[in-house]
């Protein structure tokens, strides 16, 4: 079973990837005619990732794109991700430590709904206050063991 921070990290990475897909660099990609949806999605994932050269090297980009895309630099990604704000995060269980809030903040989270009930709720609240986040305790855990 994944820990709560692993779940928060994964959710943050998914939100970041979704937001990167909305960037002008990705939205402006010109795919070759007839390229299937799965191939487009895979090309986008590789293009946004650290191994972007796999789809940009000569002999490869021509299979996917009409025009060779410019590299989507780490600086450009960071700048674009900074614009992702007012994200909402919901959790089916309480956050046991403030590190979950720290990670959520990196992905633009501003609003959190969670059951509450951790012995460290005060630490979690303090971290939310530090980033001017709004957190609501629902009082309801949404899973069974």
Q: Locations of the language-model features?
A:
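Feature captures the catalytic cores and cofactor-binding loops of soluble hydro-lyases/lyases
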Residues: 2-145
């Amino acid at each position: 079973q994944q820990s709560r921070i692993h779940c928060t990290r994964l959710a943050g990475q998914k939100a970041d990837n979704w937001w990167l897909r909305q960037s002008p660099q990705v939205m402006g990609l010109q795919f070759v005619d007839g390229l299937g949806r799965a191939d487009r999605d895979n090309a986008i994932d590789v293009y946004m990732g650290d191994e972007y050269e796999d789809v940009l090297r000569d002999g490869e980009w021509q299979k996917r794109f009409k025009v060779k895309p410019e590299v989507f630099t780490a600086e450009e990604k960071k700048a674009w991700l900074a614009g992702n704000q007012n994200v909402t995060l919901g959790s089916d269980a309480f956050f046991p430590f403030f590190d979950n809030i720290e990670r959520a903040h990196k992905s633009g989270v501003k609003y959190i709904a969670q059951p509450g009930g951790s012995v460290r709720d005060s630490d979690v609240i303090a971290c939310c206050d530090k980033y001017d986040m709004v957190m609501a305790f629902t009082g309801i855990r949404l899973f069974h063991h």
